[in-house]
Design a protein with these regions (language model features):
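Intrinsically disordered, low-complexity segments enriched in small/flexible residues
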Residues: 1-70, 170-200, 212-214, 218-305
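A structural preference for short, pocket-lining loop segments at secondary-structure junctions
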Residues: 31-36, 50-95, 105-121, 143-147
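Short, histidine-centered active-site or binding-site loop motifs used for metal coordination
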Residues: 37-40, 89, 152, 208
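Short acidic-aromatic active-site loops that bind/stabilize oxyanions
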Residues: 42-43, 47, 93-101
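Short strand->helix junction
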Residues: 42-43, 75, 125, 157
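Single, functionally critical "micro-switch" positions that shape active/binding sites
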Residues: 45, 80, 137
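Conserved strand-to-helix beginnings and helix N-cap segments that scaffold or border functional pockets
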Residues: 47-50, 79, 131, 161
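Conserved catalytic cores of soluble enzyme domains
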Residues: 97-101, 105, 109-246
Length: 305
């Protein structure tokens, strides 16, 4: 559908809508592929977008070859809808916060462990939850002008939708025999702790936010069409449902001690605030796998919890 095989969502609004809610629309873009579009303000991800992602995966698993998540706007997503979280925090509704974080995590994990290929097509701002969703896709089709980053630190929280877990997993995958593992861990920790945003898809790959199997596209107008082709390629290669990882190497107490010393000296040097220290320690705790007496191997779910 669209011009010369290009996917143009605007042209499909009257004929090819499969499902919609207030924040998302699910289109049939032909060849048994679906496309989920966000249309909240700045494409932020609140409850309606989480519902949309889950619905899209359910529909695709029943009747389609796979799913693209992407839109034709300037930005893929400015991240999770934090307004809602701050409101709940202000009202001290911490159980509600835990539930919404859990729902977000479960949705990210579902994107990765569904029975169909999920390709995320990114462009422009792809921040926070937008980055986390990309990190959990089977593949990303990134426009070269994709500005990606786990920016939650900047607003005083840790990336809790699976971004911290995913950085820990990718750190573990980078370890080679004889490597100074703590140095690699520190580098990836700093990507989160400085809320660094990549200025291009190539830089996002260098930062470890995109995988070497993710693809880059120069032409913005062909982004969704290329993402659709990626879905079909994955399907035709005999896509099989993945199993959750159980072999993520974490450093335990040895890593934690290194981080705590560094973070405390930054606090005393007045480089960071007391709250920054709290968030940095929490991130380090997750990335080191908690208070383990020695380095070991843990599962994805262990890190999320």
């Amino acid at each position: 559908p669209g011009y010369k095989g290009l996917v143009i969502l605007d042209a499909l609004k009257t004929t090819n809508v499969v499902w919609k809610n207030s924040g998302t629309t699910l289109y049939n873009v032909g060849d048994e592929v679906l496309n989920l579009e966000f249309h909240t303000k700045m494409n932020t991800m609140g409850a309606e977008v989480i519902e949309g992602i889950n619905k899209a995966i359910s529909v695709a698993e029943k009747n389609y070859k796979g799913l693209v998540i992407g839109n034709e706007g300037d930005n893929f997503s400015a991240g999770a809808n934090l307004g809602m979280l701050f409101m709940l925090a202000g009202n001290r509704e911490f159980d509600e916060i835990n539930l919404s974080v859990q729902a977000f995590q479960n949705t990210m994990m579902r994107a990765r462990y569904s029975s169909i290929p999920v390709v995320v097509a990114t462009s422009g701002l792809t921040l926070g939850g937008g980055t986390e969703l990309s990190m959990h896709a089977d593949q990303v089709r990134a426009h070269t002008e994709t500005y990606m980053g786990l920016v939650e630190f900047g607003v005083g929280i840790i990336p809790s939708g699976g971004g911290t877990k995913e950085m820990t997993l990718r750190t573990s995958d980078m370890y080679k025999k004889g490597d100074p593992e703590l140095n690699i861990l520190m580098e990836n920790f700093m990507t989160i702790a400085t809320a660094k945003v990549a200025t291009s898809s190539k830089e996002a790959a260098a930062m470890g936010l995109l995988k070497h199997t993710d693809k880059h596209t120069l032409n913005r107008s062909s982004l969704l069409s290329e993402a659709k082709n990626d879905v079909l390629n994955l399907y035709n290669e005999g896509y099989t449902q993945k199993k959750q990882r159980q072999n993520i190497k974490v450093q335990g107490r040895a890593g934690l001690a290194m981080f705590e010393a560094g973070i405390t000296s930054m606090l005393y040097g007045k480089y960071i605030s007391d709250h920054d220290r709290k968030i940095a320690n929490k991130t380090a705790y997750v990335m080191c796998g908690g208070d383990l007496s020695q380095p070991g191997y843990v599962s994805e779910q262990y890190l999320l919890d």
